[in-house]
Amino acid sequence: MKLSKLEKALKKVRVTPQRDDTYTIGNVLWAIRMCRLMGLDCCIDEATAAEVAILIGRFQSLDLQDSPLKGKDEKAILTTLKVLWSLLAGHHPENSDMAEKYWEAWTIRERESQKEEEGEITSIYPQLRKNFPAVSTSDGSPRYDPDLTKQLKIWADATEKHGVDHHAVNILGVITANLTQSEIRLLLQSTPQWRLDIQLIESKLNAREHAHRVWKESHPEAPKTDEIIGKGLTAAEQATLTTQECRDTYRQWVLEAALEVAQGKHDRPGPINIHQGPKEPYPEFVNKLVTALEGMAAPETTKQYLLDHLSVDHANEDCRAVLLPLGPSAPMERKLEACRAVGSSKQKMQFLAEAFAAINVKGDGEVQRCYGCGKPGHIRRDCKNQKCFKCGKPGHLQRNCKSKNREALLCPFWAEERIPSGEDFCDPVCSPVGIRLNRQPFIKIFLGGRWVRALIDTGADEVVLKDIHWDRIKGVPAASVVQVGVTGRNIARRKSNVEWRFKNRYGIVDVLFSNTPVNLLGRSVLQSIVTKFTLAAHTKQIQPLPVKLHGPGPRVPQWPLTLEKYKALKEIVEELLKDGKISRTPWDNPFNTPVFVIKKKGGSKWRMLMDFRALNKVTNKGQEFQIGLPYPPGIQQCEHITAIDIKDAYFTIPLDENFRQYTAFSVVPVNREGPLERYHWNVLPQGWVCSPAIYQTTTQEIIAEIKDRFPDIVLYQYMDDLLIGSDRPDHKRVVSEIREELGAYGFKTPEEKIQEEQVQWLGYELTPKRWRFQPRQIKIKKVVTVNELQQMIGNCVWVQPEVKIPLSPLSDLLKGKTDLKDKIKLTEEAIQCLETVNKRLKDPEWKERIKEGTELVVKIQLIPEGVVYDLLQDGNPIWGGVKGWDYNHANKIKKMLSIMKKLSRIVMIMTGREVSFLIPGDSEDWESALQRINTLTEIPEVKFYKHACRWTSVCGPVIERYPTYYTDGGKKGSKAAAAYWREGKIRREVFPGTNQQAELKAVLMALQDGPAKMNIITDSRYAFEGMREEPETWGREGLWKEIGEELRRKEYVGVSWVPGHKGIGGNTEVDQEVQKALQGPITVSLPQEILLEAGETKLVKTGIFWEGLRPCKLRPEEGLKLKGSLIDEELQLEITNTQNSRVGIRQGQTIGTCFIEAIPQAIEEHEKWHTTAEILAREFQLPRRVAREIVHRCQACKRTVSCPRRGTNPRERFLWQMDNTHLEGKIIWVAVETNSGLIEARVIPEESAQSIVFCILMLVYRYTVYHIHSDNGPCFIAQKVEALCKYLKITKTTGIPYNPQAQAIVERTHRDIKDKIAAFREDCETVEAALSLTLVALNKKRGGIGGHTPYEIYLESEYNKYQEQQNHYNNFKTEKWAYVRDKRKVWKGPYKVLWDGEGAAVVEENAMPTLYPHRHMRFIPPPNTDTQDGNL
């Protein structure tokens, strides 16, 4: 802000609210001057609010206890600065108090922002800890341990000079006497300057740990390895839970390892004792180091680690200065190239001469310059201003330099360098994770016209460079200053107004020059180029995958929640918002998805869920990459295994920014306390259909990188569970690096979820060599819900490889159950099945994993429900299960081949190898059965074991010379009948059962009565296929079991099938016998006692009202001379006494039998089409009472109640009413012909004019349409529909708006269609199929006017139209003549008829057309050509 504007703004601010005095520019200048007196620099010209805020903070941090400014002046200065800050920040305070409030509000916001940033870093990097000696208390919080601090100090003093030597080992034995395992590890890690010694100690400890794990397998009574090393336990738990023996063992391991390291360093020459001499060439030093490492007994990884670090740390001072910027992990070729010019003076000068040969080479037009001063006319060795290339000071050369500081000057002092651009800077300092602390934080900055590489030093106030840079840096020399540091007092030269540049930032700074070992970049520059320093690790960015919708986004409103659930949801949302997983959505986002919370199992915590069904419907779904769980036997054997769990896996992967708006949800307060709080997801939400596929795609790339980096490890991934196996001795290091790689992408792998050696993974327990199912128990309750029973069955199916029992007792209980809350009582068989499962899961057996080169065999055992199989390796089962029969195949061998094919596929997936089978029976029987199958494509390798199993069948094709039995069965009501027929021999049997049972009973009867060799012919496909499969006793139960036993006694049975009711001899006879058995006579008795005189006739009730039977004929009992017939309407029996004497009939006395006629056919017709009573009575000649009773007893027709018939409409031929209705989410177009009631309907995709146009075209080419009447719906009054009707010359009218009676006929039809669809819906898969059956029922099976169906009435209309057209055509085509009678009743003619209409005709009389009625005309055939007009 300019001074003029600032002065005007200050005049509007009062000093206090009570006074009218205002601030002036002089007050501000006084405050700035006072700050400068205290050493605080500030310039009022072009000052910003941020600079003033920094000035206020620095002023408040001053100690003014003994200063003359203490008191009123201090408060006046602070108040004036705060007023200045508020004006520069854009506020308009009226007085100083308001400026104070603005300042307090801003500081509070800054403090909260800083806390949020610190919380974010802590949540992303929870493993960050301060390096201090602390132990964990019982509640998990750290506290300082003063005793451990003393021991750390003793250990540091012991290893300060020579590292881990014999003296340090003795000290270590004393101070670790009472320490736990974690405290000993903390002690070792507290000496970072001797990290090579510690690395060797840890390598030897890992070797001892591995050896103990191997030894522990054969000595189970010994302590566990994890207990000895204290793995998975806190310091407090190690002190209380682990035994003293375990702690002493670990301490002994540490002392032995430390002693070996000390002996290797000091007893014999080793790599640790090799150092580069001051003038020794670097390649010679590296060769000696490699030779020493080759003779060292250590793993290759340890040797490589030592080579990388010793080649830098043990190099001389000159080489180390060059190698430190490269880092220890740089390739050895790069290190050798960098140190090529380091060594003797001759080598250094030769390198410089080669590097800058182009400067001293004289070319065309070029002037030779001195490399030292840059002046032309002489070279460097003749230069009078000699300067040292080592320290930069004049007066001596490099070979005579006594300074220990060295700066590599590869550019002449006088050379100009261009001003850099943003692309020249490669150090990402401005980002919070830009500076890596695994090496010294150097950056390259353009300072005073030169590139300078400086070390970031937050403890330095100013920029401090080496003295060598004094002549190179452009600036104004200023007075020297006194530096006070860790080395004491030092006088440094100073240059002011030095320009610096870094990326897109620049400024002016003072630079100090002193005898410093390294260039330092202090806070004077850092505060401008670095915003903050955070302890953050380097992370790799995950690119979100794009997602698209194929429809509109979800707009489902949020339903209300209880107060308890609202509070829980609010708490979860705040936590997610704090972690950055969700964000507040903009006000213009119209999409919404409902959200709710449920309680987690076994606790009071809540879990947030979202109903993504609407969003999932319109999301373009991808293909999930995870196709199933890995089989544990197929996991490769390893020496070490580790299981890792990824925490919040979905929440680590970002969601596509363009898609985030569709995941918006709302938090609605109770009683509408305030407005909605709207959020959307920034990461993958749970429950969204694409979250698994995106997660799998992302992690697949990361896992591929890890496998490429470690090709010798075994890595299994299932969603967020990882299993790592390897044979490496440094397995833990590999696991640590994999976790670091995952952490680089933001995936968290908590320590508490890491398992080693014996792990629980995906429901299994795994060791390096074996596996088993985790022990578990299924809770058994006598009464369960459908949902609970489904969960039980799912758990049992999961452990089938262990239990290997059929689950049919449990699955049979679910038949017919649709509601998940229905109660089911477990049967004894089901409870016994669950108890068997629990017994086998109490302590599952350990099984081996698949070994390379071993033979795999699948052994199959037969059970009634299917087969039990075991995958054998060296005779021991490693996998198994139960497979049920596939009844789609024709015989048993096809079923077995199908199961073997499935098992081969399972083993192929598990191992990638072929497998052989061990099945029951013998090879001859098996090969004989295979020869009968003509469609075999693949036969697996098979071996056999002894078992009573026959693969061939006695059933085959019919042989004519054997006797043939025709069988049939049927059912009526609850009664079933079975019969067989053979050359007039008949056997019938009636029993309660089903139709299939009747068919099987007939076959069983024929087998029982037939010879050893016979034929059976049936019209039942069920019985025919079952006979071909040969139902043995082990395969089926019930009638099939009895049939199988009978088949064992036969030598040969020919089986064939014929279609029923086709007049085939034998089948027709047996069918008639079954019908007779089902239609047997029904006895008739009277419900009350009657007395009949001789010749008397009475009407009595028969007592037969239902079962679909119509008594048609009455046969009296012997001794009764009665005559009877049925009265249709009343179902009464008219009985006449034909005897000469009185006859008395007691109550309940049987008077005769009635026989069935036509009723079964009527019932079958109604069950198919739900025909009306009028049509049944007409087609089957039934009494209307019986027909109505048939309809009344139909449950589907009971549910369909017709709507009341209100409203009338005009009815005429070929007038169609149209409308749309909705059912089950479908749109049904309906058209009804008003004269006949004929209905046409179809399902259309949408209510649009285009769909109505297609429907009208379909109606026109099927029926005659003169007139269309509809409502005022947009799709019916559209321009397309009107134009089509006009083109087809169809009259188009609409009804009265908002008056349903204008469409009364079609509205009634809507209800009729829905009722009929409801009746047919159970038998149809789709609405379209049910609609087709409905049209048949309503058009052809429903009585209308005069008892005719709508279809018949419409056909009559079409016939009448045809007759009219024919008459009209004949009137013009056929030549007619007629005699006519005039008014005088005189007949004249004949005249030619010009036109013949209805009731009258026009004749040509005397060359004039004359009209006569038909009653005055007599038509005659055309006369001959010579006929003349005349009078009769």
UniProtKB/Swiss-Prot annotation:
Q: Where is the active site?
A: D457 (for protease activity)
Free-text description of this protein's post-translational modifications in UniProt = Specific enzymatic cleavages by the viral protease yield mature proteins. The protease is released by autocatalytic cleavage. The polyprotein is cleaved during and after budding, this process is termed maturation.
Q: Which residues form the Peptidase A2 domain?
A: 452-525
- The source's superkingdom equals Viruses
* Chain ranges of the Integrase catalytic domain: 1206-1358
Residues the UniProt record annotates as site (Cleavage): Y125, P126, F351, L352, P432, V433, G522, R523, I1151, G1152
* UniProt-annotated binding residues for Mg(2+) 2: D968, E999, D1019, D1071
The entry's DNA-binding region: 1376-1422
Q: Other comments?
A: Gag proteins are synthesized on both gag and gag-pol polyproteins. Gag polyprotein (AC Q82850) is produced from conventional translation of the gag ORF. Gag-Pol polyprotein is generated by a -1 ribosomal frameshift occurring at the gag-pol genes boundary. This strategy of translation probably allows the virus to modulate the quantity of each viral protein.
Name this polypeptide is given: Gag-Pol polyprotein
- What's the source species for this entry? Jembrana disease virus
The opening ranks of the lineage are:
Viruses, Riboviria, Pararnavirae, Artverviricota, Revtraviricetes
